[in-house]
Amino acid sequence: MTLDSTMACCLSEEVKESKRINAEIEKQLRRDKKDSRRELKLLLLGTGESGKSTFIKQMRIIHGSGYSEEDKKGFTKLVFQNIFTAMQSMIRAMETLKILYKYEQNKANAQVVREVDVEKVCTFEQPYVNAIKNLWSDPGIQECYDRRREYQLSDSTKYYLTDVDRISKPGYLPTQQDVLRVRVPTTGIIEYPFDLENIIFRMVDVGGQRSERRKWIHCFENVTSIMFLVALSEYDQVLVESDNENRMEESKALFRTIITYPWFQNSSVILFLNKKDLLEDKIMYSHLVDYFPEFDGPQRDAATAREFILKMFVDLNPDSDKIIYSHFTCATDTENIRFVFAAVKDTILQHNLKEYNLV
């Protein structure tokens, strides 16, 4: 065998090996591509306090491992802090709104609660329990609570304050509902992946306050579905960041921006009109027409009000070919979210069958 033929033989072996390696790489790339397509990215968007974090908690309860006793213990301090934060907000509002306490001793109780550094709260003991119970039962504080649209107050206030006896018992362990109701503003980006029918759903929650939104841009690649949350009950409220701007108008402006982004051209859009329970309560005394004069439906009618709000959002869609899927929700109601997400999952899978190699 000549040197040339030996070299040719070696070369052909090298070429063969190179081809084999390339083929293996190509095969792996195709496999990776197929696997990556079995992961669906769901982006949760909406303004602050629309219920995005509660929705993520529900996914953990419904499709994940839920909350163990140890997990729930971790929320104890946050529940206590939520109670103090709510009462301090109302005490400040009593002054701003010039509402008087009916019972003189509640001025002293208010002072006791006001002096607490909420960040350092990790227990809930006397004299604070009594002070908060007495304040909550004062007609002045109740009037202040009824006027909560005039200042910032957590939606969970009534839920916690009517249950102070249970929450202040020694050895208190938060219930699942207590965990769902805890308010902690989202800063940064929270991802929650869960597995459904061999497909990974990666839900991404980003902070809704204006200061958080500049971080969203990093999440915009390869989004399967936009899940946009609107709080139905915010039609008469103003922003935390700006007390002369209506929260629902802000939500509409954000939704209009999101659905026209080129990034989301191929993403399905699912609109959750959340806090339907709070709307049903609020619509009885706060009239939609006072904030949206174009509303010409009957007063105290939650069904008409929510359909009007839905239409306002759907009408913002400039693309007649793009369907906006919508659901009325109550994010603190596990059974409601279980039912709604089953429908959402079907929508997402139908929308992505071919694209994600699921057929």
UniProtKB/Swiss-Prot annotation:
G5 motif, as annotated region: 329-334
Record's catalysed reaction(s): GTP + H2O = GDP + phosphate + H(+)
Keyword Iron: no
Name the UniProt record assigns to this protein: Guanine nucleotide-binding protein subunit alpha-11
Region called G3 motif, residue ranges: 201-210
Binding site for Mg(2+): 53, 186
Subcellular location: Cell membrane; Cytoplasm
Species, as recorded: Xenopus laevis
Domain G-alpha, chain residue ranges per copy: 38-359
